Amino acid sequence: QGVDPAGLLAQIQAAFGRECLPLNLPAGGGARVLDCYFNATAPAGEVPDFSSVEQAHQALVEQVVEVDPGFVERYLNDGDVDPRELHAPLEQALREGHLIPVCFVSARNGAGVAELLDVIVRLLPNPAEGNPPEFLKGEGAAAQPLHAEPDAGKHVLAHVFKITQDPYVGKMGIFRIHQGTVTRNSQLYVGDGRKPFKVGHLLVLQGKDHVEVPSAGPGEICAVAKVDEMLFDSVLHDAAEDDHIHLKSLDFPVPVHGIAIEPKRRGDEQRLWDILQKLVDEDPCLRVERVAATN
C-alpha cells in the first residue's frame, strides 16, 4: 500500500546496475507474488501489478545463459531454455554478480516471504558452491592466498564477524565456519594466540534465544561467550601452526562526527572508558580517543 514497485525496481537498477532483475512480481496490489523464473507465463487470471511474467522470465533466462556459450546457442535456436537445466549457469551468474536477484516481499501482510525462502533454498549457491572467503596467510606483501574448503573433515577455519555484549552471558563472538567442524570440546586458537580456549557452550542464535548445539560445520553461524581475546575480524583455528591467517581487510567509512564526553562524577573515568571500549568492540566504525591532558 502506497508503494510503487515499478519505481522501486527502477531505483534499484539505477543504483546497482541492470543486473538487478526480479525473480517474481507483485500481484493483487501486493497481496501475493508471481514467480517469473520457473514459470514463463502467469497463472490463468493473474496479472502482475507492473510489467509481465513473460517479459521478466525472458530477461532472467537471457541474463543467465550469457555466462555459458552452450546455452546461448540453445537459446538462440530454441527461443527458450527450461530453467531447471540452468542450475550451474545460474549459480555462476550469481557468484560473478552477472545476475542480482530481486524478490518482492511485504512486511505488512507476509506476501512473498515463503517464496523468498524457497528461492534461497532452491536457487542460491550453498556454502560449497559460493564464492570462498579471501583468506590470506602471512603479512604485508609476503601474504599468500589461502583457500578454505567447505570440508567438515579438515581443520577448522572460522571468521568472527560480530561482537556483542549480552547482558546475561557477557561478551559474545559470532562467527561463521568456513572449514572443519566445531564441537563443544573443540580447542580453538584466536588469531596468533598461543593458548587455545575450549568452546564449552556452542550456541546458535535464534532471535533473542541462544540455542546450544553439539557441533557445527562449514557454512553455519555460531557463537561462543566469555572469550576476551576474541575481537571483530578474528580468525579461529584449531591448528597451532596456522598462524598469521586473516581475511582481506574491509574498508570502513571514516567517522565524520566527533563528540567529547566526560563522566559526571570524578573517579568514574575508568568505568566510562571500559564501557566505550565495549562499544568499539561491537562497532568497528566507532573510534574512541582518550586525551591525556583533559583525561
Give the label of every model feature segment.
Residues 1-295:
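Structural and coupling elements of P-loop NTPases
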